[in-house]
């Protein structure tokens, strides 16, 4: 997963998030950070850089890698390795229409709003579901994406060592 930090026209620090195409088999229409499977012999960092270029047309090199957040095992059988990237220069986000319906720059300060994170329970699990309301998108983002964004907030913005693997995903994300 390419958790990419970049600027916007107003000079604010943002992260890039996509809305997946509706025709995709896995997680169609869901909100996601660019990412995908590792190619044989590929490191998570190389995969993040490749997927960022494939999904939103941003070509960065290895110097853009800031580090990793914790792996997140999903209910659908994937293990997400979040790689935090920094786009030092201005970049244009161009969604690949095969995979991405829309791509957005969301200011990092939305992660500091008082109601972030929101936690709720579901009957299928004893673990809390984590979500992050993002008003500019008109929706909430749910774990695993929300859990990873929450960890980014805690580690990068507040300097707190925070783990997120215990957060549950909503039932719709299990498939």
What are these regions (language model features)?
Residues 2, 52, 107:
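Terminal peptide-recognition signature
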Residues 12-54, 70, 132, 170:
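Conserved Nudix-box catalytic region and its N-terminal flanking loop in Nudix hydrolases
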């Amino acid at each position: 997963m390419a958790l990419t930090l970049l600027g916007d026209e107003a000079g604010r620090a943002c992260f890039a998030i996509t809305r997946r195409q509706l025709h995709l088999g896995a997680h169609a229409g869901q909100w996601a950070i660019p990412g995908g499977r590792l190619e044989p012999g590929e490191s998570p960092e190389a995969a993040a850089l490749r997927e960022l270029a494939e999904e939103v047309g941003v070509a960065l090199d290895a110097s853009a890698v800031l580090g990793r957040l914790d792996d997140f095992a999903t209910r659908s059988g994937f293990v997400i390795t979040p790689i935090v990237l920094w786009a030092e220069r201005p970049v244009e986000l161009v969604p690949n229409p095969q995979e991405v319906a829309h791509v957005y720059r969301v200011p990092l300060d939305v992660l500091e709003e008082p109601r972030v994170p929101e936690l709720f329970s579901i009957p299928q699990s004893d673990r809390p579901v984590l979500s992050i309301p993002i008003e500019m998108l008109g929706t909430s983002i749910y774990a695993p994406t929300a859990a990873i964004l929450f960890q980014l907030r805690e580690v990068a913005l507040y300097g707190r060592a925070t783990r997120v693997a215990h957060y549950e995903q909503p039932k719709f994300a299990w498939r």
